[in-house]
């Protein structure tokens, strides 16, 4: 099993404190978001991890991953960036956004499924947008 992590966004909505830094490289408790992801992927036996990068790709210095640079990231949406790795979508593969922290049990539940396609959804996602004046629920799919 392989994993593809989409990290080609420009982080337009991120805090000024970490501008020009990919969101996945923001540290939380001394570890980057993508390092949390890689730990979980290792625990479930993922063999190869492909990280699709865009702007600031030179800031990624992760070991044991293969990089795919989306040369057209400014013209692509998330699906366009994912298509840069289409040759790796042929077999069993996990696909993630690079700025989401998830628990091991979520990936274990996905892997137990017998379905061809499985999508993990936070059913309480709307609570994250309550009271916001910036980055409203209308932007949730972006």
Placement of each model-derived feature along the sequence:
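Canonical Radical SAM [4Fe-4S] cluster-binding loop centered on the CxxxCxxC motif
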Residues: 16
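Short, acidic Gly/Pro/Ser/Thr-rich loop/turn segments
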Residues: 11-13, 126-127
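Short alpha-helical oligomerization interface
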Residues: 19-24
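Conserved core of the sugar-phosphate nucleotidyltransferase
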Residues: 63, 104-142
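The conserved beta1-alpha1 loop
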Residues: 8
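Conserved N-terminal catalytic core of the sugar/cofactor nucleotidyltransferase
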Residues: 1-5, 13, 27, 31-95
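The conserved acidic donor/metal-binding loop of glycosyltransferases
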Residues: 98-101
């Amino acid at each position: 099993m392989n994993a593809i992590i989409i990290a080609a966004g420009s982080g337009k909505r991120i805090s000024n404190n970490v501008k020009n830094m990919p969101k996945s490289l923001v540290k939380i408790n001394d570890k980057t978001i993508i390092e949390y992801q890689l730990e979980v992927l290792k625990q479930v036996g993922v063999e190869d991890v492909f990280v699709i990068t865009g702007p600031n790709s030179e800031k990624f210095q992760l070991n044991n991953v293969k990089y795919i640079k989306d040369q057209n990231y400014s013209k692509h949406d998330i699906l366009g960036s994912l298509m840069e790795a289409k040759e790796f979508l042929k077999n069993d593969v996990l696909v993630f956004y690079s700025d989401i922290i998830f628990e091991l049990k979520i990936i274990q539940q996905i892997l137990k499924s017998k379905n061809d396609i499985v999508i993990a959804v936070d059913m309480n996602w709307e609570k994250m947008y309550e009271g916001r004046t910036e980055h409203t629920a209308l932007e949730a799919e972006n």
